[in-house]
Amino acid sequence: MKYLASFRTTLKASRYMFRALALVLWLLIAFSSVFYIVNALHQRESEIRQEFNLSSDQAQRFIQRTSDVMKELKYIAENRLSAENGVLSPRGRETQADVPAFEPLFADSDCSAMSNTWRGSLESLAWFIGYWRDNFSAAYDLNRVFLIGSDNLCMANFGLRDMPVERDTALKALHERINKYRNAPQDDSGSNLYWISEGPRPGVGYFYALTPVYLANRLQALLGVEQTIRMENFFLPGTLPMGVTILDENGHTLISLTGPESKIKGDPRWMQERSWFGYTEGFRELVLKKNLPPSSLSIVYSVPVDKVLERIRMVILNAILLNVLAGAALFTLARMYERRIFIPAESDALRLEEHEQFNRKIVASAPVGICILRTADGVNILSNELAHTYLNMLTHEDRQRLTQIICGQQVNFVDVLTSNNTNLQISFVHSRYRNENVAICVLVDVSSRVKMEESLQEMAQAAEQASQSKSMFLATVSHELRTPLYGIIGNLDLLQTKELPKGVDRLVTAMNNSSSLLLKIISDILDFSKIESEQLKIEPREFSPREVMNHITANYLPLVVRKQLGLYCFIEPDVPVALNGDPMRLQQVISNLLSNAIKFTDTGCIVLHVRADGDYLSIRVRDTGVGIPAKEVVRLFDPFFQVGTGVQRNFQGTGLGLAICEKLISMMDGDISVDSEPGMGSQFTVRIPLYGAQYPQKKGVEGLSGKRCWLAVRNASLCQFLETSLQRSGIVVTTYEGQEPTPEDVLITDEVVSKKWQGRAVVTFCRRHIGIPLEEAPGEWVHSVAAPHELPALLARIYLIEMESDDPANALPSTDKAVSDNDDMMILVVDDHPINRRLLADQLGSLGYQCKTANDGVDALNVLSKNHIDIVLSDVNMPNMDGYRLTQRTRQLGLTLPVIGVTANALAEEKQRCLESGMDSCLSKPVTLDVIKQTLTVYAERVRKSRES
């Protein structure tokens, strides 16, 4: 209830705040209006100032023109003075000039003596002034020119116009200025003197200018002019009723057009300024004051303030009207908003109060516990009686866990077992209540349901235990059958190499096929049983996916060749050299897919494509077999499921292989998919994550950069892969169309070359070739299509074979030097298992090799110390001394004979460990006769060459 009361108070406060907002908006409009009026006033002041400046320019021109006249008259007077007699020379006169008489300026002035002395000078000056008046004075509007002697201060008046002379006024003005001039400091006495006296009517006066005349650096006389000044000439035509006043240097009014009542006195604020613009004290007038050089006078223009405001009066009235209208509009809007928003909101608050009371009653009467918990600390804000009872059953730890779950917002329900063994299921949703984040919780007693689920779980566990027991039984039986089967299969393989009576060979072949199928079935059942009983674990470690793929193709290549199929293995350059995973299980999956592809393909080829796909390693197995119908693809990975009818039923199997593959890949965090069409073949794609991937360095094979290889490959996929691989190694690749090669060029083809190749070598990719590349004739190499990624290494050996021909370890075996009689080779077989040891010895005997056996590494060292051994075939994992320690001990004794490891763990790291211990090679069980023959041929030839050297 307090919440709703607070809400109503908030609404009331919001109403007052809205009114305050309206007032602030009105004040903002008022301030904007004032700013606009002030801006208009400044603009009007700028216009008036511009008009004042233009008018003052006319006054300045008047003063400047008078100053120029004084300079001309002074020049005339000084240049006509005779330096010899101190008089103006009258030469050049043609007419007689009127000579003015001297008049005393002071009572003690003696003008009679001066009249006689200056008679000639005055006559000459009068003639020149008369000449100047007739030709130039009209342009300057002068009234008279006068000359005053410097000693006795008598004045000679040269009238230029016929106008009455107010002698007393003029003499008084001259008397005052002459005294001022004579008493001035020496620095100021050499400058011109300007003043103005009032005329017969307002706005008209007389402007006087006085300048000294020197002769031989001695003041001889004072020359002056009088000119009528009219203030009306200092106005521009306009609408402003402006006044104009000229002040002296002390700020006293000399002449004004506005009348004595409006005369402006000098203001200390602007008397020292050359130019000043502003309002007078009391803001009665707007004035502009400017000096009039070269005189010491100043001119002041003024205009009443009411005339300034007259132009913006309408702007002021409009602004006032705008503020009144804006205030009325804002007041109306505020009232309307209150009536339509705030008043209805207060009514809604009252209704909410009623609704909350109603909801409280519903919650209190609910058959389940309902409560509201604060998200921050889990405190119970509101709850019914049942929820209160349930919450009291919870322990402190349960309350803390419930609070953490609510804060985490990861799940929406939790099951809790209370202290009295009551099972509560608490579900909740997040919401807002009283301005807080809360969780609305519903508590339900699910004890009955939990007991039922426990009963069902016990039944399921019993069934699971029975299933696991069955799986364990199958796994145990299958494992016990596998060991003797290895001996059966190996001996049957050896028996097939013997000369058998007619009909017996068919029986042996059937026995061999049945044994292999039985071994495959037992292995699948064992793996599936381990998966079902959760005993099969993924053992991740670092391995090389390249080595795993090479090993798989090497195992299945003989079977592919026997079926007259082609096996292409494309390992892209972006495949990591190492990653973390379970190589044994990956090998099992790919081997199963490859085995199925061989089994269901009668013609065509099989492609194994390995590449990096983002963060995954993608392995694709594609065949040209019978294909799978779309409706059966969805059940392809079900246990014991076999595809279709007809031809598919001719292939035996348990139907567990793909189910095991899917489960293994899923355990490795990968996925497997299939794309198939009947009659077109199938494509299986396996993806595993690239955990801890290490990528190869992007650089070419040393020594191959710039070499040229010609491609004449019909298979488009093989051609594209070879081109990319060779270019990555720095080799120049060109399509061969019959061009003439250079002696260093190599031809790469997948068909028989009709004519002799004139280059360095020919490499032919053959689907029937098994094993490492062989040189069948000088410069003619045969290469398996199952390992095209090894072509750059072969090319490196082809180009370097002449440089390293003296090293027998780098020599390649060739078929023309193969030895069919191997009785000169003594091979030591080391294996702790008697059947495997005997089987391997028999296989070597069938190939013509001499053989000795040893039980373990210690026994092998004893045999080596007493007999000459050429090659050692040793099991890796043996008691007493394993194959690794045997090899290391052999190398420590200084023996360099080839040591070949034989292991059941045919993984990349196992082979790498064998090589690091000092072994020359490593074979994987089961070891077939073909693999033994091919491997021993290489090392036997190496031993024979070392004997010859």
UniProtKB/Swiss-Prot annotation:
Its EC number is 2.7.13.3. Residues 42-313 are periplasmic. Gene3D superfamilies: 1.10.287.130, 3.40.50.10970, 3.40.50.2300, Histidine kinase-like ATPase, C-terminal domain (3.30.565.10). The modification 4-aspartylphosphate is found at D875. The keyword Nucleotide-binding applies. Residues 705-805 form the ABL domain. InterPro entries: CheY-like_superfamily (IPR011006), HATPase_C_sf (IPR036890), His_kinase_dom (IPR005467), HisK_dim/P_dom (IPR003661), HisK_dim/P_sf (IPR036097), RcsC (IPR030856), RcsC_C_sf (IPR038388), Sig_transdc_His_kin-like_C (IPR004358). It catalyses: ATP + protein L-histidine = ADP + protein N-phospho-L-histidine. Autophosphorylated. Activation probably requires a transfer of a phosphate group from a His in the transmitter domain to an Asp in the receiver domain. Residues 357-425 form the PAS domain. It holds the Pfam family HisKA. Residues 1-19, 336-949 are cytoplasmic. Residues 476-692 form the Histidine kinase domain. It comes from the Bacteria. It is a multi-pass membrane protein. The chain crosses the membrane at residues 20-41, 314-335. CDD domains: HATPase_EvgS-ArcB-TorS-like (cd16922), HisKA (cd00082), REC_hyHK_CKI1_RcsC-like (cd17546). Keywords: ATP-binding, Cell inner membrane, Cell membrane, Kinase, Membrane, Nucleotide-binding, Phosphoprotein, Transferase, Transmembrane, Transmembrane helix, Two-component regulatory system. PROSITE patterns: ABL, HIS_KIN, RESPONSE_REGULATORY. PANTHER family: HYBRID SIGNAL TRANSDUCTION HISTIDINE KINASE J. Belongs to the RcsC family. HAMAP family: RcsC (MF_00979). This is Sensor histidine kinase RcsC.
